[in-house]
């Protein structure tokens, strides 16, 4: 028996999920506050729902990371069951960002250990199999393993760029398939902006590890093949983020969300646009997961 809703029914369902989601602006205030609160207090004040109480049980950073990853992947994979085609494929591709972040973090950890580049690259394929594809068809694996050719002169950052471009192309292609049934311009613009800001985070991580990152963000974004107006907007926002974080990069995530927040909210102003509403929910949940992680780790003070 199919659980798929009609497009109209899915619009209402996603609207309810948005209304029940924590307020991102409020989470930002909590993280930045001189008197921050913990998850338990946030639940008791109604800022978070009772379902977030499971993060109170975690005893280590690894436990927290695994619990948050599983919580949000399950939430979004469960959403796919109810969303009609072709929107379900958009969700399926978008949520690979959770896996992408996880794999890229592991790549930088390997590089921090100052292992030879070819050795690092040889370790990435089993890493992808374990993290990304352990519950998926092996037929999907070549989509990303094409980045692991380990050509002479290939760097870890080259692999990261390749992963990122494949991800962006996959999601953009699903959006273009949706353009046959409704306008996608707003969602596509916000997705490209979101992806640009994530790319900047990857470059920041690379530089913080004192790795070889001989690339400017404008060149990185250009290589992603984004439309020029969106690329210029992304670079403008990234330059502003840099001015805020150049003395302390631990503020990067906060300023990343602040730089996209108003445009993200604008997706809710498109009357009867299901794809805009769905895109809002997916990006909201990604940033929400990041802030819940900070609360769960008691990382409240940013000063």
Task: Please give the residue ranges for each predicted region.
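N-terminal domain-start signal
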Residues: 1-303
